[in-house]
Amino acid sequence: MSSKEDYIIKPESVSPSNDTSQWPLLLKNYDKLLVRSGHYTPIPAGSAPLNRDIKSYVSSGVINLDKPSNPSSHEVVAWIKRILRVEKTGHSGTLDPKVTGCLIVCIDRATRLVKSQQGAGKEYVCIVRLHEQLKDDKELNRALENLTGALFQRPPLISAVKRQLRVRTVYDSKLIEFDNKRGLGVFWASCEAGTYMRTLCVHLGMLLGVGGHMQELRRVRSGAMSESDNLVTLHDVLDAQYVYDNTRDESYLRKIIQPLESLLVGYKRVVVKDSAVNSVCYGAKLMIPGLLRYEEGIELYDEVVLMTTKGEAIAIGIAQMSTVDLQSCDHGIVAKVKRCIMERDTYPRRWGLGPIAQKKKQMKADGKLDKYGRVNENTPENWKKDYKDLDEQPAPPIPESKLVAPEPQLPKKKSLIEEVEVDIDVEDKSEKKEKKDKKEKKEKKDKKEKKEKKDKKEKKRKAEDDSSKSEKKKKSKKD
Protein backbone atom coordinates (compact mmCIF):
# COMPACT_ATOMS: atom_id res chain seq x y z
CA MET A 1 0.00 0.00 0.00
CA SER A 2 1.31 3.45 -0.91
CA SER A 3 1.03 6.20 1.64
CA LYS A 4 -0.95 9.40 1.08
CA GLU A 5 2.26 11.44 1.13
CA ASP A 6 3.29 10.00 -2.28
CA TYR A 7 0.51 12.00 -3.99
CA ILE A 8 1.32 15.35 -2.38
CA ILE A 9 3.26 17.96 -4.42
CA LYS A 10 6.01 19.07 -2.11
CA PRO A 11 7.30 22.66 -2.22
CA GLU A 12 10.80 22.94 -3.71
CA SER A 13 13.21 25.86 -3.87
CA VAL A 14 14.58 24.75 -7.29
CA SER A 15 12.25 24.50 -10.30
CA PRO A 16 13.10 22.04 -13.10
CA SER A 17 14.54 23.80 -16.16
CA ASN A 18 14.69 22.81 -19.83
CA ASP A 19 18.11 22.20 -21.35
CA THR A 20 18.04 24.62 -24.30
CA SER A 21 21.76 24.39 -25.14
CA GLN A 22 20.93 21.93 -27.97
CA TRP A 23 18.05 23.98 -29.42
CA PRO A 24 18.68 25.15 -33.01
CA LEU A 25 19.79 28.54 -34.35
CA LEU A 26 18.34 31.58 -32.53
CA LEU A 27 16.60 29.45 -29.87
CA LYS A 28 19.92 28.17 -28.46
CA ASN A 29 20.20 28.89 -24.69
CA TYR A 30 16.68 30.39 -24.76
CA ASP A 31 16.26 29.81 -21.02
CA LYS A 32 19.25 32.09 -20.31
CA LEU A 33 17.50 35.12 -21.85
CA LEU A 34 16.17 37.68 -19.36
CA VAL A 35 12.36 37.53 -19.02
CA ARG A 36 10.32 40.71 -19.37
CA SER A 37 6.91 39.01 -19.50
CA GLY A 38 5.70 35.42 -19.64
CA HIS A 39 2.13 36.27 -20.66
CA TYR A 40 1.26 36.27 -24.37
CA THR A 41 -1.16 34.56 -26.75
CA PRO A 42 0.57 32.22 -29.21
CA ILE A 43 -0.64 32.53 -32.82
CA PRO A 44 -0.51 29.42 -35.06
CA ALA A 45 0.88 31.48 -38.00
CA GLY A 46 4.54 31.16 -39.01
CA SER A 47 6.76 28.12 -38.46
CA ALA A 48 10.16 27.20 -37.04
CA PRO A 49 12.99 27.85 -39.56
CA LEU A 50 13.85 24.15 -39.95
CA ASN A 51 10.18 23.12 -40.38
CA ARG A 52 9.24 25.49 -43.22
CA ASP A 53 7.77 23.95 -46.38
CA ILE A 54 10.40 23.37 -49.07
CA LYS A 55 9.44 26.39 -51.20
CA SER A 56 9.74 28.93 -48.37
CA TYR A 57 12.75 27.01 -46.95
CA VAL A 58 14.67 27.54 -50.21
CA SER A 59 13.49 31.14 -50.68
CA SER A 60 14.69 32.10 -47.18
CA GLY A 61 17.90 30.07 -47.25
CA VAL A 62 21.66 30.55 -47.56
CA ILE A 63 24.33 28.29 -49.04
CA ASN A 64 27.88 28.17 -47.67
CA LEU A 65 29.51 27.49 -51.04
CA ASP A 66 33.06 26.30 -51.69
CA LYS A 67 33.83 28.53 -54.68
CA PRO A 68 35.91 26.77 -57.35
CA SER A 69 38.94 28.39 -59.00
CA ASN A 70 38.55 30.29 -62.34
CA PRO A 71 34.88 31.46 -62.49
CA SER A 72 34.10 34.84 -60.91
CA SER A 73 31.81 35.20 -57.87
CA HIS A 74 29.05 36.73 -60.02
CA GLU A 75 29.16 33.81 -62.46
CA VAL A 76 28.89 31.27 -59.62
CA VAL A 77 25.92 33.12 -58.08
CA ALA A 78 24.20 33.29 -61.50
CA TRP A 79 24.69 29.52 -61.95
CA ILE A 80 23.05 28.81 -58.57
CA LYS A 81 20.15 31.10 -59.50
CA ARG A 82 19.66 29.07 -62.70
CA ILE A 83 20.06 25.66 -60.98
CA LEU A 84 17.58 26.38 -58.16
CA ARG A 85 15.24 28.41 -60.42
CA VAL A 86 14.87 31.27 -57.93
CA GLU A 87 14.21 34.98 -58.49
CA LYS A 88 17.18 36.55 -56.68
CA THR A 89 20.61 35.55 -55.42
CA GLY A 90 23.40 37.55 -53.79
CA HIS A 91 26.79 36.88 -52.22
CA SER A 92 28.65 37.95 -49.09
CA GLY A 93 31.68 39.58 -50.73
CA THR A 94 33.52 39.12 -54.02
CA LEU A 95 36.30 36.56 -54.40
CA ASP A 96 38.79 36.94 -57.28
CA PRO A 97 38.42 34.29 -60.03
CA LYS A 98 41.51 32.30 -58.95
CA VAL A 99 40.61 32.43 -55.22
CA THR A 100 38.69 29.51 -53.64
CA GLY A 101 36.80 29.02 -50.38
CA CYS A 102 33.76 30.32 -48.49
CA LEU A 103 31.24 32.27 -50.51
CA ILE A 104 27.92 32.77 -48.72
CA VAL A 105 25.15 32.73 -51.35
CA CYS A 106 21.85 34.26 -50.18
CA ILE A 107 18.60 33.24 -51.91
CA ASP A 108 15.49 35.43 -52.43
CA ARG A 109 14.40 36.73 -49.01
CA ALA A 110 17.87 36.14 -47.50
CA THR A 111 19.38 38.69 -49.93
CA ARG A 112 18.24 41.30 -47.40
CA LEU A 113 21.17 40.18 -45.23
CA VAL A 114 23.81 40.53 -47.97
CA LYS A 115 24.93 44.02 -46.86
CA SER A 116 25.49 42.93 -43.25
CA GLN A 117 27.56 39.93 -44.41
CA GLN A 118 29.67 41.95 -46.86
CA GLY A 119 30.87 44.19 -44.04
CA ALA A 120 31.71 41.28 -41.70
CA GLY A 121 35.30 40.15 -41.00
CA LYS A 122 37.05 37.53 -43.12
CA GLU A 123 39.74 34.87 -42.59
CA TYR A 124 42.18 33.60 -45.23
CA VAL A 125 44.92 31.00 -45.71
CA CYS A 126 47.49 32.40 -48.13
CA ILE A 127 50.62 31.10 -49.90
CA VAL A 128 53.25 33.81 -50.40
CA ARG A 129 56.23 33.40 -52.74
CA LEU A 130 59.40 35.31 -51.82
CA HIS A 131 61.76 36.20 -54.68
CA GLU A 132 64.97 35.39 -52.75
CA GLN A 133 66.04 33.23 -49.80
CA LEU A 134 66.03 34.73 -46.30
CA LYS A 135 69.09 34.72 -44.05
CA ASP A 136 66.96 33.67 -41.07
CA ASP A 137 63.75 31.58 -41.24
CA LYS A 138 62.23 33.56 -38.34
CA GLU A 139 62.28 36.83 -40.30
CA LEU A 140 58.97 36.03 -42.07
CA ASN A 141 57.19 35.42 -38.75
CA ARG A 142 58.49 38.75 -37.39
CA ALA A 143 57.39 40.57 -40.57
CA LEU A 144 53.89 39.05 -40.25
CA GLU A 145 53.66 40.27 -36.66
CA ASN A 146 54.65 43.77 -37.82
CA LEU A 147 51.91 43.75 -40.46
CA THR A 148 49.02 43.52 -37.98
CA GLY A 149 46.72 46.32 -36.89
CA ALA A 150 45.67 49.24 -39.10
CA LEU A 151 47.57 49.25 -42.42
CA PHE A 152 47.65 51.56 -45.42
CA GLN A 153 46.68 49.71 -48.60
CA ARG A 154 46.26 50.65 -52.24
CA PRO A 155 44.24 48.20 -54.40
CA PRO A 156 46.29 46.08 -56.86
CA LEU A 157 46.91 47.28 -60.45
CA ILE A 158 44.10 45.07 -61.78
CA SER A 159 41.10 45.77 -59.53
CA ALA A 160 37.42 46.65 -59.85
CA VAL A 161 37.67 49.75 -57.63
CA LYS A 162 39.46 53.09 -57.80
CA ARG A 163 43.09 52.81 -56.68
CA GLN A 164 42.83 55.11 -53.68
CA LEU A 165 44.91 54.77 -50.51
CA ARG A 166 42.78 53.25 -47.73
CA VAL A 167 43.18 51.95 -44.19
CA ARG A 168 42.34 48.31 -43.47
CA THR A 169 42.84 46.34 -40.23
CA VAL A 170 44.54 42.95 -39.94
CA TYR A 171 43.34 41.60 -36.58
CA ASP A 172 45.60 38.55 -36.30
CA SER A 173 47.98 36.45 -38.39
CA LYS A 174 49.88 33.20 -37.89
CA LEU A 175 52.66 31.53 -39.92
CA ILE A 176 51.71 27.89 -40.60
CA GLU A 177 54.70 26.70 -42.64
CA PHE A 178 57.75 28.15 -44.42
CA ASP A 179 60.16 26.55 -46.91
CA ASN A 180 63.11 28.94 -47.25
CA LYS A 181 64.78 27.01 -50.12
CA ARG A 182 61.71 27.22 -52.36
CA GLY A 183 60.75 30.68 -51.02
CA LEU A 184 57.20 29.58 -50.17
CA GLY A 185 55.33 30.48 -46.97
CA VAL A 186 51.82 29.53 -45.81
CA PHE A 187 50.08 31.84 -43.32
CA TRP A 188 46.61 32.42 -41.85
CA ALA A 189 45.18 35.94 -41.42
CA SER A 190 42.02 37.35 -39.86
CA CYS A 191 41.18 40.77 -41.28
CA GLU A 192 38.59 43.45 -41.94
CA ALA A 193 36.31 43.27 -44.99
CA GLY A 194 37.98 44.86 -48.02
CA THR A 195 41.57 43.93 -47.08
CA TYR A 196 43.70 43.03 -50.11
CA MET A 197 45.76 39.91 -49.36
CA ARG A 198 47.65 40.40 -52.63
CA THR A 199 48.83 43.82 -51.41
CA LEU A 200 49.70 42.33 -48.00
CA CYS A 201 51.99 39.76 -49.69
CA VAL A 202 53.74 42.52 -51.68
CA HIS A 203 54.24 44.48 -48.44
CA LEU A 204 55.70 41.35 -46.78
CA GLY A 205 58.26 41.08 -49.59
CA MET A 206 59.12 44.78 -49.29
CA LEU A 207 59.49 44.54 -45.51
CA LEU A 208 61.85 41.56 -45.85
CA GLY A 209 63.81 43.33 -48.60
CA VAL A 210 63.55 40.42 -51.05
CA GLY A 211 60.27 41.13 -52.85
CA GLY A 212 57.27 38.82 -52.91
CA HIS A 213 53.85 38.12 -54.37
CA MET A 214 50.73 36.08 -53.63
CA GLN A 215 50.87 32.55 -55.05
CA GLU A 216 47.52 31.16 -53.90
CA LEU A 217 44.62 32.18 -51.65
CA ARG A 218 41.67 30.49 -49.92
CA ARG A 219 38.99 32.11 -47.75
CA VAL A 220 38.32 29.93 -44.70
CA ARG A 221 35.74 32.16 -42.97
CA SER A 222 33.29 34.77 -44.17
CA GLY A 223 31.33 36.54 -41.44
CA ALA A 224 29.35 34.00 -39.42
CA MET A 225 30.28 30.94 -41.51
CA SER A 226 33.53 29.01 -41.84
CA GLU A 227 34.77 25.95 -43.75
CA SER A 228 33.43 23.66 -41.01
CA ASP A 229 29.85 25.04 -41.24
CA ASN A 230 28.25 22.78 -43.86
CA LEU A 231 30.49 23.80 -46.80
CA VAL A 232 29.06 22.53 -50.13
CA THR A 233 30.21 22.50 -53.76
CA LEU A 234 28.37 23.47 -56.94
CA HIS A 235 28.04 19.76 -57.77
CA ASP A 236 26.19 19.22 -54.47
CA VAL A 237 23.71 21.98 -55.35
CA LEU A 238 23.14 20.53 -58.83
CA ASP A 239 22.68 16.98 -57.47
CA ALA A 240 20.28 18.12 -54.72
CA GLN A 241 18.04 19.91 -57.22
CA TYR A 242 18.18 16.91 -59.59
CA VAL A 243 17.17 14.50 -56.78
CA TYR A 244 14.27 16.77 -55.76
CA ASP A 245 13.04 17.19 -59.37
CA ASN A 246 13.11 13.45 -60.10
CA THR A 247 12.30 11.75 -56.78
CA ARG A 248 10.66 14.57 -54.77
CA ASP A 249 13.16 13.88 -51.97
CA GLU A 250 13.70 17.15 -50.04
CA SER A 251 16.33 15.85 -47.62
CA TYR A 252 19.37 16.55 -49.84
CA LEU A 253 18.14 20.08 -50.64
CA ARG A 254 17.50 20.77 -46.94
CA LYS A 255 21.02 19.53 -46.15
CA ILE A 256 22.87 21.92 -48.47
CA ILE A 257 20.66 24.98 -47.81
CA GLN A 258 20.56 26.50 -44.32
CA PRO A 259 17.93 28.93 -42.96
CA LEU A 260 18.89 32.62 -43.03
CA GLU A 261 18.76 32.61 -39.20
CA SER A 262 22.14 30.80 -39.24
CA LEU A 263 23.77 34.12 -40.29
CA LEU A 264 22.28 35.96 -37.30
CA VAL A 265 23.43 33.75 -34.41
CA GLY A 266 26.12 36.30 -33.47
CA TYR A 267 23.62 39.11 -32.81
CA LYS A 268 22.04 39.95 -29.44
CA ARG A 269 18.46 38.63 -29.39
CA VAL A 270 15.16 40.33 -28.56
CA VAL A 271 12.06 38.07 -28.45
CA VAL A 272 8.81 39.68 -29.66
CA LYS A 273 5.21 38.71 -28.88
CA ASP A 274 3.33 37.07 -31.76
CA SER A 275 0.74 39.88 -31.73
CA ALA A 276 3.45 42.53 -32.36
CA VAL A 277 5.25 40.69 -35.20
CA ASN A 278 3.25 42.02 -38.16
CA SER A 279 3.37 45.63 -37.00
CA VAL A 280 7.20 45.36 -36.86
CA CYS A 281 7.12 43.91 -40.41
CA TYR A 282 5.23 47.05 -41.49
CA GLY A 283 8.02 49.22 -40.02
CA ALA A 284 6.65 50.02 -36.56
CA LYS A 285 9.06 50.49 -33.66
CA LEU A 286 9.07 47.72 -31.06
CA MET A 287 7.61 49.04 -27.79
CA ILE A 288 7.90 47.63 -24.25
CA PRO A 289 4.43 45.93 -24.28
CA GLY A 290 5.51 43.79 -27.27
CA LEU A 291 8.68 42.52 -25.56
CA LEU A 292 8.92 38.99 -24.10
CA ARG A 293 12.63 38.26 -23.55
CA TYR A 294 15.97 39.95 -24.23
CA GLU A 295 19.65 39.16 -23.96
CA GLU A 296 22.19 40.40 -21.44
CA GLY A 297 24.75 43.00 -22.48
CA ILE A 298 22.63 45.02 -24.92
CA GLU A 299 23.95 48.59 -25.14
CA LEU A 300 22.29 51.68 -26.60
CA TYR A 301 22.35 51.72 -30.46
CA ASP A 302 23.63 48.12 -30.69
CA GLU A 303 22.41 46.05 -33.65
CA VAL A 304 20.01 43.37 -32.38
CA VAL A 305 17.94 40.67 -34.07
CA LEU A 306 14.18 40.73 -33.39
CA MET A 307 12.84 37.17 -33.31
CA THR A 308 9.59 35.28 -32.71
CA THR A 309 9.02 32.60 -30.07
CA LYS A 310 9.37 29.99 -32.84
CA GLY A 311 12.91 31.19 -33.61
CA GLU A 312 12.17 33.12 -36.84
CA ALA A 313 14.09 36.32 -37.56
CA ILE A 314 11.72 39.29 -38.01
CA ALA A 315 14.18 42.14 -38.54
CA ILE A 316 17.55 43.60 -37.65
CA GLY A 317 16.98 46.54 -35.33
CA ILE A 318 18.87 49.33 -33.56
CA ALA A 319 18.46 49.10 -29.77
CA GLN A 320 16.96 52.25 -28.22
CA MET A 321 17.42 50.95 -24.66
CA SER A 322 20.17 49.07 -22.87
CA THR A 323 19.58 45.87 -20.86
CA VAL A 324 19.45 47.93 -17.64
CA ASP A 325 16.73 50.21 -19.07
CA LEU A 326 14.70 47.23 -20.31
CA GLN A 327 14.64 45.80 -16.79
CA SER A 328 13.36 48.99 -15.16
CA CYS A 329 11.19 50.82 -17.76
CA ASP A 330 7.48 50.10 -18.18
CA HIS A 331 7.04 52.11 -21.41
CA GLY A 332 9.13 53.35 -24.32
CA ILE A 333 10.80 52.21 -27.55
CA VAL A 334 12.88 49.02 -27.35
CA ALA A 335 14.27 49.03 -30.91
CA LYS A 336 13.86 50.68 -34.31
CA VAL A 337 13.81 48.53 -37.45
CA LYS A 338 16.97 48.81 -39.57
CA ARG A 339 16.28 46.00 -42.09
CA CYS A 340 13.08 43.98 -42.18
CA ILE A 341 13.60 40.29 -43.05
CA MET A 342 10.19 38.63 -42.63
CA GLU A 343 7.51 39.09 -45.29
CA ARG A 344 4.49 41.22 -44.34
CA ASP A 345 1.29 39.43 -43.28
CA THR A 346 3.10 36.19 -42.39
CA TYR A 347 1.43 36.78 -39.01
CA PRO A 348 -2.08 38.31 -38.83
CA ARG A 349 -2.63 41.99 -38.11
CA ARG A 350 -3.34 42.61 -34.45
CA TRP A 351 -3.86 46.36 -34.50
CA GLY A 352 -7.24 48.09 -34.86
CA LEU A 353 -9.01 45.47 -32.70
CA GLY A 354 -10.02 47.79 -29.81
CA PRO A 355 -13.66 48.89 -29.18
CA ILE A 356 -13.24 52.40 -30.68
CA ALA A 357 -11.36 51.09 -33.73
CA GLN A 358 -14.11 48.48 -34.32
CA LYS A 359 -16.83 51.12 -34.01
CA LYS A 360 -14.98 53.40 -36.45
CA LYS A 361 -14.66 50.51 -38.92
CA GLN A 362 -18.41 49.86 -38.74
CA MET A 363 -19.22 53.56 -39.23
CA LYS A 364 -17.01 53.65 -42.34
CA ALA A 365 -18.90 50.64 -43.71
CA ASP A 366 -22.28 52.33 -42.99
CA GLY A 367 -21.18 55.59 -44.68
CA LYS A 368 -21.25 57.61 -41.44
CA LEU A 369 -17.55 58.43 -41.89
CA ASP A 370 -15.60 58.88 -45.12
CA LYS A 371 -12.98 56.31 -46.17
CA TYR A 372 -10.26 58.22 -44.26
CA GLY A 373 -12.29 58.19 -41.01
CA ARG A 374 -13.24 61.88 -41.24
CA VAL A 375 -16.61 63.40 -40.33
CA ASN A 376 -19.25 63.80 -43.08
CA GLU A 377 -22.94 64.87 -43.22
CA ASN A 378 -24.18 61.44 -41.99
CA THR A 379 -22.01 61.40 -38.85
CA PRO A 380 -24.03 61.33 -35.56
CA GLU A 381 -23.75 64.36 -33.24
CA ASN A 382 -22.30 62.44 -30.27
CA TRP A 383 -19.32 61.37 -32.46
CA LYS A 384 -18.80 64.92 -33.76
CA LYS A 385 -18.45 66.24 -30.19
CA ASP A 386 -15.42 64.07 -29.45
CA TYR A 387 -13.94 64.34 -32.97
CA LYS A 388 -10.97 66.69 -33.37
CA ASP A 389 -9.87 67.60 -36.87
CA LEU A 390 -6.19 68.46 -36.54
CA ASP A 391 -6.19 70.30 -39.90
CA GLU A 392 -8.86 72.77 -38.73
CA GLN A 393 -7.56 73.40 -35.21
CA PRO A 394 -6.78 77.10 -34.49
CA ALA A 395 -3.18 78.24 -34.50
CA PRO A 396 -1.57 78.86 -31.07
CA PRO A 397 -2.02 82.46 -29.76
CA ILE A 398 0.77 84.94 -30.57
CA PRO A 399 2.50 86.36 -27.46
CA GLU A 400 1.80 90.06 -26.70
CA SER A 401 5.46 91.00 -27.08
CA LYS A 402 5.24 90.09 -30.77
CA LEU A 403 1.92 91.95 -31.35
CA VAL A 404 3.64 95.39 -31.31
CA ALA A 405 4.00 96.56 -34.89
CA PRO A 406 7.60 97.17 -35.93
CA GLU A 407 8.65 100.68 -36.95
CA PRO A 408 8.40 101.25 -40.70
CA GLN A 409 11.83 101.32 -42.27
CA LEU A 410 12.35 103.69 -45.18
CA PRO A 411 14.44 102.39 -48.06
CA LYS A 412 18.04 103.55 -47.84
CA LYS A 413 19.25 105.94 -50.51
CA LYS A 414 22.05 104.54 -52.62
CA SER A 415 25.22 106.52 -53.06
CA LEU A 416 26.30 107.72 -56.51
CA ILE A 417 29.10 105.10 -56.67
CA GLU A 418 26.65 102.25 -55.87
CA GLU A 419 24.23 103.48 -58.57
CA VAL A 420 27.04 103.59 -61.15
CA GLU A 421 28.15 100.04 -60.14
CA VAL A 422 24.59 98.76 -60.58
CA ASP A 423 24.39 100.36 -64.05
CA ILE A 424 27.71 98.74 -65.04
CA ASP A 425 26.44 95.32 -63.83
CA VAL A 426 23.26 95.69 -65.88
CA GLU A 427 25.28 96.67 -68.97
CA ASP A 428 27.64 93.69 -68.48
CA LYS A 429 24.70 91.29 -68.20
CA SER A 430 23.08 92.65 -71.37
CA GLU A 431 26.40 92.38 -73.26
CA LYS A 432 26.88 88.78 -72.11
CA LYS A 433 23.35 87.92 -73.21
CA GLU A 434 23.93 89.45 -76.66
CA LYS A 435 27.19 87.52 -77.08
CA LYS A 436 25.48 84.29 -76.05
CA ASP A 437 22.65 84.86 -78.56
CA LYS A 438 25.15 85.60 -81.37
CA LYS A 439 27.12 82.46 -80.51
CA GLU A 440 23.98 80.29 -80.57
CA LYS A 441 22.89 81.76 -83.94
CA LYS A 442 26.35 81.12 -85.40
CA GLU A 443 26.34 77.51 -84.14
CA LYS A 444 22.89 76.90 -85.66
CA LYS A 445 24.05 78.40 -88.98
CA ASP A 446 27.19 76.21 -89.02
CA LYS A 447 25.14 73.09 -88.28
CA LYS A 448 22.73 73.94 -91.10
CA GLU A 449 25.60 74.48 -93.57
CA LYS A 450 27.25 71.19 -92.56
CA LYS A 451 23.97 69.35 -93.02
CA GLU A 452 23.44 70.89 -96.48
CA LYS A 453 26.99 69.94 -97.55
CA LYS A 454 26.42 66.39 -96.29
CA ASP A 455 23.13 66.12 -98.21
CA LYS A 456 24.80 67.40 -101.41
CA LYS A 457 27.58 64.81 -101.06
CA GLU A 458 25.02 62.05 -100.50
CA LYS A 459 23.03 63.09 -103.61
CA LYS A 460 26.23 63.26 -105.69
CA ARG A 461 27.32 59.80 -104.51
CA LYS A 462 23.90 58.30 -105.25
CA ALA A 463 23.92 59.84 -108.75
CA GLU A 464 27.40 58.39 -109.39
CA ASP A 465 26.26 54.96 -108.15
CA ASP A 466 23.19 55.06 -110.41
CA SER A 467 25.26 56.07 -113.46
CA SER A 468 27.82 53.30 -112.81
CA LYS A 469 25.01 50.74 -112.48
CA SER A 470 23.39 51.87 -115.75
CA GLU A 471 26.77 51.65 -117.55
CA LYS A 472 27.28 48.10 -116.25
CA LYS A 473 23.80 47.09 -117.47
CA LYS A 474 24.51 48.54 -120.95
CA LYS A 475 27.81 46.62 -121.15
CA SER A 476 26.14 43.37 -120.07
CA LYS A 477 23.43 43.82 -122.76
CA LYS A 478 26.08 44.42 -125.48
CA ASP A 479 27.96 41.27 -124.37
From Swiss-Prot:
Its EC number is 5.4.99.-. InterPro entries: Dyskerin-like (IPR012960), PsdUridine_synth_cat_dom_sf (IPR020103), PsdUridine_synth_N (IPR002501), PUA (IPR002478), PUA-like_sf (IPR015947), PUA_sf (IPR036974), tRNA_PsdUridine_synth_B_fam (IPR004802), TruB_C (IPR032819). It is found in: Nucleus, Nucleolus. It comes from the Eukaryota. CDD domains: PseudoU_synth_hDyskerin, PUA_Cbf5. Coiled coil: none annotated. GO terms for biological process: box H/ACA sno(s)RNA 3'-end processing; mRNA pseudouridine synthesis; rRNA pseudouridine synthesis; snoRNA guided rRNA pseudouridine synthesis; snRNA pseudouridine synthesis. It catalyses: uridine in 5S rRNA = pseudouridine in 5S rRNA; uridine in snRNA = pseudouridine in snRNA; a uridine in mRNA = a pseudouridine in mRNA. Residues 358-479 are annotated as: Disordered. Residues 363-374, 382-391, 461-470 have a biased composition (Basic and acidic residues). Its main location: nucleus. It is an enzyme of class 5 (isomerase). Residues 435-460 have a biased composition (Basic residues). Component of the small nucleolar ribonucleoprotein particles containing H/ACA-type snoRNAs (H/ACA snoRNPs). PANTHER family: CENTROMERE/MICROTUBULE BINDING PROTEIN CBF5, H_ACA RIBONUCLEOPROTEIN COMPLEX SUBUNIT DKC1. Belongs to the pseudouridine synthase TruB family. This is H/ACA ribonucleoprotein complex subunit CBF5. It comes from Candida albicans (strain SC5314 / ATCC MYA-2876).
